[in-house]
Design a protein with these regions (language model features):
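Catalytic cysteine-centered active loop of the rhodanese-like fold, especially the PTP/DSP P-loop
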Residues: 90-145
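Non-catalytic regulatory/accessory regions that flank a structured catalytic core
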Residues: 1-55, 134, 140-144, 156-211
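Short coil/turn segments at secondary-structure boundaries
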Residues: 70-75, 89-93, 116-120, 148, ...
Length: 211
C-alpha cells in the first residue's frame, strides 16, 4: 500500500488508486483538480476507439431532466442528484479492480454541476473504502471539457435527440426553479458530509488524499 501511496504523491498522471496511468488523453480544463477530456476523445470513446484499453465506460449527465430529455450524448445516464451518485458507489459495477471501468461526468458547460457531482462521487468512494486506501470502486473518472454544449456543437450526430436545451431556456423556468430548490438541500447535506470526510482524512496516519 505504501508503494501505491508514494507513487500517487510523486506521479501526477496516475488514476485514483495509483495503479495505472490514465487510459484516455487528458486536456488542461478549467478545474485543475480534475482530469478533463475533450469532446473529440468522448466521440472516439463512443465509436470504440478505446475498447482495447478499457473494460467499460459510463457517461454521467448531471444536467436537469428537462435538459437531458431535450438532447444528450448517446448512451449517457441522467444522474443529477446526490442520491443517484451515491447509488453509483454502492452498485456492483466498478468493484473489480482488475478491470478498467471509467466514468465521464458532464453538465451543460462542465463548470458547476458536473464537477460538483464528480467530486462528490470521489469523496463517497474514498469514505466507503477508507479502510483500504487507496483502493477505489471508480479510480478512473473524467470531466468532459466544455460540457454538453461543446460536445453538441462538434458531434451533433452522436446526440439523441439531436438537440440542445439550455438550462435557462424560457420554456422550462418552472422546472428550473423546482430543481434549484432541491439542489440547495443537496448542497447543505454535502457540506456536512465534507466536514465528516475531513475528520477522517486528518485522523489518518497516511494523510489520505481524496484524489
Amino acid at each position: 500500500m505504501k508503494t501505491a501511496v508514494d507513487k500517487m504523491q510523486n506521479e501526477v498522471d496516475l488514476i485514483g488508486d495509483g495503479s495505472e496511468v490514465h487510459s484516455l488523453p487528458t486536456t488542461q480544463g478549467r478545474h485543475k483538480d480534475l482530469k478533463s477530456v475533450t469532446p473529440h476523445t468522448v466521440s472516439q470513446l463512443l465509436t470504440g476507439e478505446y475498447d482495447d484499453v478499457i473494460s467499460s465506460y459510463r457517461i454521467i449527465d448531471c444536467r436537469y431532466p428537462y435538459e437531458y430529455e431535450g438532447g444528450h450524448i448517446e448512451g449517457a445516464e441522467n444522474l443529477h442528484t446526490h442520491a443517484l451518485i451515491k447509488d453509483l458507489v454502492t452498485s456492483l459495477q466498478g468493484r473489480d479492480s482488475t478491470q478498467r471501468n471509467i466514468l465521464v461526468f458532464h453538465c451543460e458547460f462542465s463548470s458547476e454541476r458536473g464537477p460538483k457531482l464528480l467530486r462528490l462521487l470521489r469523496n463517497l468512494d474514498r469514505k466507503q473504502n477508507s479502510d483500504r486506501y487507496p483502493f477505489l470502486f471508480y479510480p478512473e473518472v473524467y470531466l468532459l471539457d466544455g460540457g454538453y454544449k461543446a460536445f453538441y456543437e462538434q458531434h451533433q450526430s452522436q446526440c439523441n435527440p439531436r438537440n440542445y436545451v439550455p438550462m435557462l431556456h424560457q420554456d422550462y423556468s418552472k422546472q428550473l426553479r423546482h430543481f434549484r430548490v432541491k439542489s440547495k438541500s443537496w448542497t447543505a447535506g454535502e457540506k456536512q458530509s465534507m466536514r465528516s470526510r475531513r475528520l477522517i482524512i486528518d485522523s489518518s496516519p497516511l494523510k489520505m488524499s481524496p484524489w
